[in-house]
Amino acid sequence: MDETKSELLRKYEQKFKALADQKRLEIMYELCQRGKTCVCDLTEIFEVTQSKLSYHLKILLDANLITKETKGTWSYYDLNDEEVNGLLSEELCCIFRKKGEGDCC
């Protein structure tokens, strides 16, 4: 496997690991429903400490599944629609396409 494909698979591994947690899926769902949301509101919604919530938000940020905007002392998070919508994209499907089943990438 060449380095490019290896890097691509690592990128998807990080995203799927981030999604492999119910709390993070719940966070993403709330952001999808609410749009840009202050971390202070998220702590109330999920009834967790800010440090525990920050742990999950960092994993989602590192996987590029959410975005963060800082205004003053508060951080606002939103779903990265483009990244989430492309997660099960043609690109990923092509990686696992059997040889001889046509070109797609």
Swiss-Prot record:
HTH arsR-type domain ranges (all copies): 4-99
Keyword Ribosomal protein: no
Residue ranges flagged as DNA-binding region: 39-62
InterPro entries: ArsR-like_HTH (IPR011991), ArsR_HTH (IPR018334), HTH_ArsR_DNA-bd_dom (IPR001845), HTH_MetalResp_TranReg (IPR051081), WH-like_DNA-bd_sf (IPR036388), WH_DNA-bd_sf (IPR036390)
Highest taxon, organism lineage: Bacteria
GO molecular function, one term: DNA binding
GO biological process: one example: regulation of DNA-templated transcription
SUPFAM superfamilies tied to this protein: Winged helix' DNA-binding domain
PROSITE patterns attached to this UniProt entry: HTH_ARSR_1, HTH_ARSR_2
Pfam families: HTH_5
Keywords of the record: Arsenical resistance, DNA-binding, Repressor, Transcription, Transcription regulation
Function per UniProt: Transcriptional repressor for the ars operon.
The protein's name: Arsenical resistance operon repressor
Gene: arsR
